[in-house]
């Protein structure tokens, strides 16, 4: 995987009540990632960007909701979410990340 692709795979952290609870309970971090990203690419990107060791990666596709407006029915975009489990003793501090 080339260096340019590493910077494009991770789109940002997912901030929600569920992701905060998972992070505290089982040393996981949740990221929004590119739709065509694989588990291997996500693992390599997290290890390279945050200098941490990744134990495992789980991914899921989030389907966009159907929303109604006064002009008709629209749909939000589908996206991919990755649950990254860090090895024991590792953590990611987003305030200090490079």
Swiss-Prot record:
InterPro entries, A to Z: Nucleotide-bd_a/b_plait_sf, Ribosomal_uL23-like, Ribosomal_uL23/eL15/eS24_sf
**Pfam families on file:** Ribosomal_L23 (PF00276)
Q: Which UniProt keywords apply?
A: Ribonucleoprotein, Ribosomal protein, RNA-binding, rRNA-binding
**GO function terms (MF aspect):** rRNA binding; structural constituent of ribosome
Q: Which GO terms describe its cellular component?
A: ribonucleoprotein complex; ribosome
Reading the lineage from the top rank, the first entry is Bacteria
User: A biological process (GO) annotation for this entry?
Assistant: translation
How is the quaternary structure described?
Answer: Part of the 50S ribosomal subunit. Contacts protein L29, and trigger factor when it is bound to the ribosome.
Which NCBIfam families does the entry mention? PRK05738.1-3 (NF004359), PRK05738.2-4 (NF004363)
The record's function comment reads: One of the early assembly proteins it binds 23S rRNA. One of the proteins that surrounds the polypeptide exit tunnel on the outside of the ribosome. Forms the main docking site for trigger factor binding to the ribosome.
Q: Which family would the database say this protein is a member of? A: Belongs to the universal ribosomal protein uL23 family.
Full protein name = Large ribosomal subunit protein uL23
